[in-house]
Amino acid sequence: MTFTTTPRRLAKTLALAAGMSVVSLSAFAGDAALYGPVAPKGSSFVRVYNASNQEVSATVGSTNLSEVAPLASSDFSFMPGGDYSAKIGSQTVPVKLAADHYYTLVNNSSGQPQLIEEPPFKNKQKSLVRVQNLSDKALTLKTADGKTDVVKSVAAKGRGEREINPVKVSLALYDGDKKVGDVKPVALERGEAAVLYVTGSGSSISPVWVKRPVSTR
């Protein structure tokens, strides 16, 4: 049996195919608008945490990381791995970014900016509490009453972390058995990393949670 394709049937078929293409392209465009551009394989990811009391702007190479308010952070921006010049405020530092790695560029209230590596968190069932201790003393993150260790002793200039169940919790930093500062309550969400950046020295330390901006999650 043979089928004859009439001009009218052929026109309908082409019109249907064209319509489906338009729908597919529209859906793709909608996804791009919703999720933003997809980072190419081998990209590096960088954000800024501004630990100072003044707004700063930052660039890494030719990538603008936007204006960042005091004690706030930008979202991650991606770029090819490699060697770059990072400018934050009036200071410029060389940085080396490895492919498929995440980093936070910290603007300190005094001293040069610091590039801190942020290993990605991939457990969708738990929350991650990470302490980036940029202070000059070892610190332990505990529950506010001091009874339970959440992240045990993190060395000065070191990093410590722990996966926990999603919860809203009040915490504090301890130097041994001595409380050195309360930490703002934080709501820990499933699949999310909450990073506590501790800057300063001596008795003047500043603990601030750094999380991705709500509008970009």
Swiss-Prot record:
Keywords: Alginate biosynthesis, Periplasm, Signal. GO terms for cellular component: periplasmic space. GO terms for biological process: alginic acid biosynthetic process. It is found in: Periplasm. Residues 1-29 form the signal peptide. The keyword Signal applies. Pathway: Glycan biosynthesis; alginate biosynthesis. Together with AlgI and AlgJ, forms an inner membrane complex which probably interacts with the alginate polymerization-transport complex and adds acetyl groups at the O-2 and O-3 positions of mannuronate residues. Acetylation of alginate is important for the architecture of biofilms and increases the ability of alginate to act as a defense barrier. Belongs to the AlgF family. This is Alginate biosynthesis protein AlgF. It comes from Pseudomonas fluorescens. The gene is algF.
